[in-house]
Each structure stands twice: as C-alpha cells, then as structure tokens.
Amino acid sequence: MANTIKVTQTKSSIGRLPKHVACLRGLGLRRINHTVELEDTACVRGMINKVHYMVKIEE
C-alpha cells in the first residue's frame, strides 16, 4: 500500500487567499482540528506546501 500522511488544519481559512482556501478544500479539510489521511503524492505535497502555515503534518 502507498505511504499515507495525516494532515490536520490548525488555523482558520477565513480571510486567506482564495487559492489557499481552495487547497484546503482540495485536501478535504473543512474546519480547525479536522484531520484527514491522504496518500503521499507530489500533488498532495504541493497543496500542503502552499498552506503549510495552516496545517500540521504527521508522517
């Protein structure tokens, strides 16, 4: 099975750039402290890098 990573939203998306809000939605994050488990792919890593200041990552 592919490697997975856990991503948790730690800060609000209110007042953020629309592209950053779209990245959070693309990752499946909806609210603060919401955690999702995603496959560790280049696309997912790119979205995480854009919103790194709003999320916490666990490998």
UniProtKB/Swiss-Prot annotation:
CDD domains to which the protein is assigned, alphabetical: Ribosomal_L30
Keywords, alphabetical: Ribonucleoprotein, Ribosomal protein
Top-rank taxon: Bacteria
GO biological process: translation
GO CC annotation, single: cytosolic large ribosomal subunit
One protein family per Pfam: Ribosomal_L30
Stretches that traverse the bilayer: none
GO molecular function annotation: structural constituent of ribosome
Keyword Ribonucleoprotein: yes
Entry's family note: Belongs to the universal ribosomal protein uL30 family.
Quaternary structure (record): Part of the 50S ribosomal subunit.
The protein, known as: Large ribosomal subunit protein uL30
Species in which this protein is naturally found: Photobacterium profundum (strain SS9)
